[in-house]
Amino acid sequence: MAPGGVVGHRLAFMEQLHDVVLVVDFGAQYAQLIARRVREANVYSEIVPHNMPVRDMLAKEPAAIILSGGPASVYVEGAPSVDPALFNAGVPVLGICYGFQAMAQALGGQVAHTGASEYGRTSLCITSAGQLLSRIPHTISVWMSHGDSVSRAPEGFSTLARTAGAPVAAFEDVERRLVGVQWHPEVHHTESGQTVLEHFLFDIAGCRPDWNASSIVGDQIAQIRGQVGDRRVICGLSGGVDSAVAAALVQRAVGDQLTCVFVDHGLLRQGEAEQVKNDFVAATGADLVVADESQRFLDALAGVTDPETKRKIIGREFIRTFEDVAKRLNADQPIDFLVQGTLYPDVVESGGGEGAANIKSHHNVGGLPDDFQFSLVEPLRTLFKDEVRAVGLELGLPEDIVWRQPFPGPGLAIRIIGEVTAERLEVLRTADAITREEMGAAGLDRKVWQCPVVLLSDVHSVGVQGDGRTYGSPIVLRPVTSEDAMTADWARIPYDVLEKISTRITNACPQINRVVLDITSKPPATIEWE
């Protein structure tokens, strides 16, 4: 089955088991955040494009529909619009920001250029709580991002709230179960935002809160057994949480029909290869084949400094190594399926969901050779990262694996700016291990999304160590906070923790005489340096 068919079948399977809330994506990054907030309320959600025909949306039998925000103005030629038929289908609908304005326009309300744009924190006054805003304080701080405003609600709708720049900041038609808000309840900066969403999901739409780690595990085990039957499966373990949880799910479903392959490319952090070989096997009982190919990867990377070339070489060598192992295993007993740890954001961002725009390619979604003769098993393809961690804990995986910070597939190779050598890898491993140890001791390891440690091996910085002048390389600390890695802010690490990290690194690594802190958000910078 083609990957698109796999995801379509898996999504349809979820729709049969749970109430589904469709999040209609109007082109901003808010759709994923809305979908995650719905799932935090224990309700299953899916993202669909704004140009999906209403009949196709209704074919999914949604319990509710949410129209997301977006960057367009309803007055711009070619701006996304909403088919009015959606509001006559009897399905509860919540419009947010642009979705609120498009909803108002489609139903005969008025959207105007008021000249009073609102961006960021804004004071909102609730004028009539209604059903949507019941039990919400009279005045709250909300997150706004709009230039146009609804100036008149559609006929039959009650106006619920206003701000200085939005005379109609929320409305509802209780009888038709149609509601909307100008602000972003899904953003953490909005006070009572999750409460507003849950009023819509439970009080207005009547959704069932049955989406949780236990139900996900049960659903996926049934799905995997139905797909695999009595045939054999192979899984490539990277040392990361995604592949570990995917493998553990398949192991729980089909037992010794699964063989895991760990390609040790020598580019992992300190202790991670041993963690895969020992802790994962002990927790799952999985059959593990280890291919130690560190020298092969170092030889292939010799003399290479361009980051994109590094990525391509590592990807090529990984696939070749994995294929070699798979062929040997397949010769003993045929293997039909390959497990991948693809996540739902990978699918959405790669345009592999339901027609979404292709933002970027992902190594889990594309990149496999055309002649790769396995059918894909992707048990995490409907899940966000926080759900993957919850499933990992439900399956009994060690916390060190479940809470492992995101780590790039090419490993430390793209955290060395310059040529990758055995000596540079050892220096970076030591600096990274010290950083992780001190962050953990300070209780920051789960508060920080990730903390890349980067070696600027081609930069030489003058220093004084002992009684002499040195020319060493700087180490960069890149701690960031994020929810999904699409955007990130630099993490405010206490100075005393930074001091300990810097002192320990420069003492342990004579090649390093300077430790610097990257305080750039994403955008404009990416999280990784290469």
Swiss-Prot record:
Catalytic reactions on record: XMP + L-glutamine + ATP + H2O = GMP + L-glutamate + AMP + diphosphate + 2 H(+)
Pathway annotation: Purine metabolism; GMP biosynthesis; GMP from XMP (L-Gln route): step 1/1
Domain Glutamine amidotransferase type-1: 20-210
Record's GO cellular component terms: cytosol
MF terms (GO), sorted A to Z: ATP binding; GMP synthase activity
UniProt cross-references to Pfam families, sorted A to Z: GATase, GMP_synt_C, NAD_synthase
Domain GMPS ATP-PPase: start-end pairs: 211-404
CDD domains cross-referenced by the UniProt entry: GATase1_GMP_Synthase (cd01742), GMP_synthase_C (cd01997)
Active site per the UniProt annotation: C97 (nucleophile), H184, E186
InterPro entries, alphabetized: Class_I_gatase-like, GATASE, GMP_synth_C, GMP_synth_GATase, GMP_synthase, GMPS_ATP_PPase_dom, NAD/GMP_synthase, Rossmann-like_a/b/a_fold
Keywords assigned: ATP-binding, Glutamine amidotransferase, GMP biosynthesis, Ligase, Nucleotide-binding, Purine biosynthesis
Residues reported in the UniProt entry to bind ATP: S238, G239, G240, V241, D242, S243, A244
EC number(s) on file: 6.3.5.2
Function recorded in the entry: Catalyzes the synthesis of GMP from XMP.
Quaternary assembly: Homodimer.
PANTHER family on file: GMP SYNTHASE [GLUTAMINE-HYDROLYZING] (PTHR11922:SF2), GMP SYNTHASE-RELATED (PTHR11922)
NCBIfam families: guaA_Cterm, guaA_Nterm, PRK00074.1
Name assigned to this protein: GMP synthase [glutamine-hydrolyzing]
